[in-house]
Amino acid sequence: IEFVTFKTLVNEYISQWTGKDDSYYLRSAFWLSAFNDKPIKSIKPRHIEKVLAKYADGKINGYGSNMPKSNNTVLRMKSVLSSIFQYAIDKNYLDKNPATKVRIKAVPNQIERFLSEDERERLLNACKEASWDRMHLLVLLAITTGMRKSELLNLRWSDINFEDGLATLNTTKNGEKRINPIPTVALDELKQHREVGSGLIFFSRYNLDKPIDFRKPWFIALEKVQITDFRFHDLRHTAASYLVMGGATLHETGEILGHKSEQTTKRYAHLSTGHKSALSERVMNKVFKNK
């Protein structure tokens, strides 16, 4: 086949894709907006690198917030495109995959951003006034449980054990089921929205079986209280910081957050310094007072 547009390729690829990760569709749509009716044989590594560079710098509207992206986020975006082109090769539309020659320029991952106590209260108050009535619930759950955005958006009422204050996460980043505790402050608000059945808690008003796109009320809330350089994912970092500074060990924190690697949790090690100092002070003072 001499002439196949990128749009035709993506539509064909998506129609046969059987994965469960909804973000895959969003990333495919991102690439569709970048190349659209461009013939696939005319797309070169330099074209892909240009798009990814702008995406990494947060200069492209569309998928995700308009903020600098981490290396891993950029690599995931590239991976989707590579899979699309691999499909084209399998269908004999292409001989080579232009995405395989693209190199991601290494940049330091963004420093984790945590909400201060004042920022947290201002943000939660702004979310109470959002046009979407579950904005406050979503943010409160993110802060108090440390769940990922995808885990929250895939939560169903049938996943919530109100009696024990637990959520069963069937759709996690690591592909493993996880039981997550829900603190009383969040559980009480969940009860206010409680519905019978197994529907999504955070559903789209256009399709009850699809998660809501909450970016607009989220960004409005951030802008309203003038909180800058903050991503929704940073609510997870905020939850981790509260756990560690509250005395949870790094292992316990990793268990709650669902980290597969202890190395991931070690990024919060510096936050436990104060807790360790207080613990050492308390124990040693007790030891030497007994002498």
Task: State each model region's role.
Residues 43, 134-136, 228-247, 269:
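Short basic/aromatic active-site micro-motif
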Residues 122-126, 178-184, 188, 192, ...:
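DNA/chromatin major-groove-contacting recognition/catalytic segments
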Residues 159-166, 229, 248-267:
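Short, polar N-cap/turn motifs at the start of nucleic acid-interacting alpha helices
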Residues 61, 67-71, 75-77, 90, ...:
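Basic, Lys/Arg- and aromatic-enriched nucleic-acid-binding interface segment
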Residues 114, 171-175, 185, 257-282:
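Catalytic-site neighborhood detector that most strongly recognizes the C-terminal catalytic loop/helix
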Residues 57, 192, 198, 204-208, ...:
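C-terminal secondary-structure termini that scaffold catalytic or DNA-interacting sites
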Residues 164, 183-228:
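Active-site/catalytic core of tyrosine-dependent DNA strand-transfer enzymes
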Residues 7-67, 84-86:
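Basic/aromatic-enriched alpha-helical hairpins
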